């Protein structure tokens, strides 16, 4: 069979480049379009070059030789991308037509809506224009969820301080204030005290002005205020060590939801995730409830052909509470870990769906559990504050070393990989925690509880050597 051509809108996020490009290129010819060259790391650029038959970069972002250089790491691209949505759509269409693309995909949350519009114009399978907008704008998302037969929660659009005051009056506390257009829990804030609520709103609103997003990202209101979803851990798990929420990965094919795998989590720092354990140890009844909720949510958004990453709160009486869902792959190493544990290559499966619809080899339910577990974990400054190594008043630190002492792992759990910020790395402790991962590690073991306890031990006992900047 002749290899089909897939246009990849290359940017940050989703399935990591170290898996995506090799997996995709094994079956498809890849054309990579880079709308934000400044958002590509050196290793990402090398993989794009290695596995693409052609690479197109937006020429408007090359003003000097320095613009051809790529940094070693990026969490969030802070340079401006000032092209409106329609111009981005036209760029995608032009490149797709130039190479006769049979499908278009991206791993980046911020280009989901322009890509959907380009797919529609070209007659290619995609998420669907309205569905993509529903999945990108969290106000529209919550409206769709509330109509989809899942737990309905109070919510209100927020643009101004007056809107926030009205939301606070209507919803009460605890209340979640969430940016409608971002990802990675950036800016998500729990409001519990009415006395300080307005100060919190102003703080988050001011901070978000410093976070650049492409001009093509559109929304009706910058915030959504929602009632807090209260978890009930003991109704779902029979052992300690996990969190009261999970994520479930799936695929939409011609408007039908296909669940793939559920990830357990370890306790968060605020709303910042700390680790994902693949697969989940939840019992079959619990998994069935989660799958039913995810199906209603994603089909309720109207999604047609795309990957889905759905986050669900585990509430009282085993009621799933929809947090949000994205029309893209999960980030971190969750997609590679599904392949490690189950042998399913979701990167290839998505492209199969985009090219062939339901003729792709889709699973008929959650993948069966294999005899081992893989955990994808990060360490943040807050872990070292909690274990007393970073002074609570510190505003900055310069890392000298991060080490994991011997004797922390439980059962047959082993460290597969470990990486830490390089010596001399400066960390601004005033940033949202999600920006400040300072170490990452992967664990593997035959017992999920041993893996979870090993994570907890590492969080409590990892050794940080650093210099601190304290307020005068």
Swiss-Prot record:
<dbReference type="InterPro" id="IPR011761">
    <property type="entry name" value="ATP-grasp"/>
</dbReference>
<feature type="binding site">
    <location>
        <position position="182"/>
    </location>
    <ligand>
        <name>Mg(2+) 1</name>
    </ligand>
</feature>
<feature type="binding site">
    <location>
        <begin position="184"/>
        <end position="185"/>
    </location>
    <ligand>
        <name>ATP</name>
    </ligand>
</feature>
<dbReference type="GO" id="GO:0046872">
    <property type="term" value="F:metal ion binding"/>
</dbReference>
<feature type="binding site">
    <location>
        <position position="109"/>
    </location>
    <ligand>
        <name>Mg(2+) 1</name>
    </ligand>
</feature>
<dbReference type="GO" id="GO:0034026">
    <property type="term" value="F:L-amino-acid alpha-ligase activity"/>
</dbReference>
<feature type="binding site">
    <location>
        <position position="324"/>
    </location>
    <ligand>
        <name>Mg(2+) 2</name>
    </ligand>
</feature>
<dbReference type="Pfam" id="PF13535">
    <property type="entry name" value="ATP-grasp_4"/>
</dbReference>
<keyword id="KW-0067">ATP-binding</keyword>
<feature type="binding site">
    <location>
        <position position="324"/>
    </location>
    <ligand>
        <name>Mg(2+) 1</name>
    </ligand>
</feature>
<dbReference type="GO" id="GO:0005524">
    <property type="term" value="F:ATP binding"/>
</dbReference>
<feature type="binding site">
    <location>
        <begin position="328"/>
        <end position="331"/>
    </location>
    <ligand>
        <name>substrate</name>
    </ligand>
</feature>
<keyword id="KW-0436">Ligase</keyword>
<keyword id="KW-0479">Metal-binding</keyword>
<comment type="subunit">
    <text>Monomer or homodimer.</text>
</comment>
<feature type="domain" description="ATP-grasp">
    <location>
        <begin position="142"/>
        <end position="355"/>
    </location>
</feature>
<feature type="binding site">
    <location>
        <begin position="309"/>
        <end position="311"/>
    </location>
    <ligand>
        <name>substrate</name>
    </ligand>
</feature>
<dbReference type="InterPro" id="IPR052032">
    <property type="entry name" value="ATP-dep_AA_Ligase"/>
</dbReference>
<keyword id="KW-0045">Antibiotic biosynthesis</keyword>
<feature type="binding site">
    <location>
        <position position="311"/>
    </location>
    <ligand>
        <name>Mg(2+) 2</name>
    </ligand>
</feature>
<keyword id="KW-0547">Nucleotide-binding</keyword>
<comment type="function">
    <text>Part of the bacABCDEFG operon responsible for the biosynthesis of bacilysin, an irreversible inactivator of the glutaminase domain of glucosamine synthetase. Catalyzes the formation of alpha-dipeptides from various L-amino acids in the presence of ATP. In vivo catalyzes the ligation of L-alanine and L-anticapsin (epoxycyclohexanonyl-Ala) to produce the final bacilysin antibiotic (L-Ala-L-4S-cyclohexenonyl-Ala dipeptide).</text>
</comment>
<feature type="binding site">
    <location>
        <position position="273"/>
    </location>
    <ligand>
        <name>substrate</name>
    </ligand>
</feature>
<protein>
    <recommendedName>
        <fullName>Alanine--anticapsin ligase</fullName>
        <ecNumber>6.3.2.49</ecNumber>
    </recommendedName>
</protein>
<feature type="binding site">
    <location>
        <position position="268"/>
    </location>
    <ligand>
        <name>ATP</name>
    </ligand>
</feature>
<keyword id="KW-0460">Magnesium</keyword>
<feature type="binding site">
    <location>
        <position position="138"/>
    </location>
    <ligand>
        <name>ATP</name>
    </ligand>
</feature>
<comment type="pathway">
    <text>Antibiotic biosynthesis; bacilysin biosynthesis.</text>
</comment>
<feature type="site" description="Plays a key role in restricting the N-terminal substrate specificity to small amino acids such as L-Ala">
    <location>
        <position position="332"/>
    </location>
</feature>
<dbReference type="GO" id="GO:0017000">
    <property type="term" value="P:antibiotic biosynthetic process"/>
</dbReference>
<feature type="binding site">
    <location>
        <position position="178"/>
    </location>
    <ligand>
        <name>ATP</name>
    </ligand>
</feature>
<dbReference type="InterPro" id="IPR013815">
    <property type="entry name" value="ATP_grasp_subdomain_1"/>
</dbReference>
<feature type="binding site">
    <location>
        <begin position="226"/>
        <end position="229"/>
    </location>
    <ligand>
        <name>ATP</name>
    </ligand>
</feature>
